[in-house]
């Protein structure tokens, strides 16, 4: 009788394991992507326009991708002002980049969900200055007020939002020496800069969605 009970328990465990594997395969594992970039960096601008937006438009509907973007790059520092009541930042590509980064940080605060802020943040990316960005990036159904976003970007609050990104870099990407810097499930992959959509399909998204291109052997 004990032997029969043991066989029965093993059978139940085996069936449960198969059921779990099927459920996991049907739903797929979540892929967590975190990217860091600079507002006036041409490499960041190219990647956002030709890689992350197309990737999201093709794979976002799968519900298997989490994405976070942080407007903070290399050779960037933020320190408290002498009065300690403000923040002074110095950016890789000058003050215009700091302001663009601050504007992006304000947008992300106002629209914390990636799918809501990604189009606006991408629009801001690479613009000559925040005035040009504000002129074209807050039209349509963005749910954002142009004046309020500009005020935020040029305020102490906007500078603080931007400077807070430095702590995130220190925690998640202390070795960052390039922008854009892309982490997938906590690890940096340079291949994700070159063809994000293809790389995700080939290495991380299983089962493979029908939207994916033909697999490449790495």
Swiss-Prot record:
Coiled coil start-end: none
Signal sequence segment: 1-21
Pfam families reported in the protein's UniProt record: GILT (PF03227)
GO MF annotation list: oxidoreductase activity; oxidoreductase activity, acting on a sulfur group of donors, disulfide as acceptor
Keyword Protein biosynthesis: no
Listed GO CC annotations: extracellular region
Keywords annotated in UniProt: Glycoprotein, Secreted, Signal
Glycosylation-annotated residues: 129, 185
Annotated localization: Secreted
Presence of keyword Glycoprotein: yes
PANTHER family hit by this protein: GAMMA-INTERFERON INDUCIBLE LYSOSOMAL THIOL REDUCTASE GILT, GILT-LIKE PROTEIN ZK669.3
Annotated family: Belongs to the GILT family.
Protein name in UniProt: GILT-like protein ZK669.3
Gene source species: Caenorhabditis elegans
Taxonomic placement: Eukaryota, Metazoa, Ecdysozoa, Nematoda, Chromadorea
């Amino acid at each position: 009788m004990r032997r029969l009970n043991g066989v029965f328990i093993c059978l139940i465990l085996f069936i449960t394991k198969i059921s779990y594997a099927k459920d996991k395969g049907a739903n797929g594992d979540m892929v967590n992507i975190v990217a860091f970039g600079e507002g006036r960096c041409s490499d960041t601008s190219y990647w956002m326009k030709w890689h992350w937006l197309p990737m999201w438009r093709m794979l976002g509907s799968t519900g298997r991708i989490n994405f976070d973007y942080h407007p903070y790059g290399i050779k960037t520092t933020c320190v408290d002002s002498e009065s300690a009541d403000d923040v002074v930042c110095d950016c890789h590509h000058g003050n215009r980049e700091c302001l663009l980064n601050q504007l992006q940080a304000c947008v992300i605060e106002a629209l914390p969900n990636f799918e809501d802020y990604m189009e606006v943040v991408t629009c801001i990316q690479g613009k000559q200055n925040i005035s040009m960005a504000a002129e074209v990036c807050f039209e349509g159904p963005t749910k954002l007020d142009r004046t309020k976003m500009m005020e935020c970007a040029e305020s102490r609050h906007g500078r603080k939002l931007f400077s807070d990104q430095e702590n995130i870099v220190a925690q998640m990407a202390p070795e960052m020496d390039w922008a854009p810097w892309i982490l997938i499930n906590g690890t940096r992959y340079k291949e994700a800069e070159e063809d994000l959509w293809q790389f995700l399909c080939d290495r991380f998204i299983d089962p493979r969605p029908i939207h994916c291109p033909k697999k490449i052997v790495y």
